[in-house]
Amino acid sequence: NGIIYDSHVYPWKTVDWDEAVTVIADKYPILIGELGHYGDDAKPVEGPQPESSRIWVPKVLDWIDKHNYHMTAWCFHPTAGPCIIKSFDNEPTDFYGVYIKEFLEKKMQ
C-alpha cells in the first residue's frame, strides 16, 4: 500500500502509545522514527520527563520489541539530544545510550 506510520516517542509526550500507535499496526508498518531521554537531571525545553531514564527507556524498548516495530534512536551526536553518545569516541551515555547499545546488541545475536 506504500504507507508507513512513523511516530516519535518521548517521555514528555503524554500519549498512550498503544492507543496512538498499536491500534493501526495491523494495517500499516510501524517505524518509531525517534525516541530518547535526556537523563534524570535534565530539564528539556520540550517539557518534563515524568519517569526516570532507568524506567522509561527499557520500558519503551520492550514495547518496541514486543510489537516487532522498527526504530531509530535519536541522536547519535554528543551535543544534539537526547544524546546516545558522550563524545565522538562513541562511548554511550549512561542515561540512554547504554540501553540502546544493549538493545541493538541483543538484536544482532
Each model region followed by its residue ranges:
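Short, solvent-exposed turn/loop segments enriched in Gly/Ser/Thr/Pro and often Arg
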Residues: 73-81
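Extended, charge-rich low-complexity interaction segments
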Residues: 98-109
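Extracellular glycoside hydrolase catalytic/binding regions
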Residues: 1-69, 85-95, 105
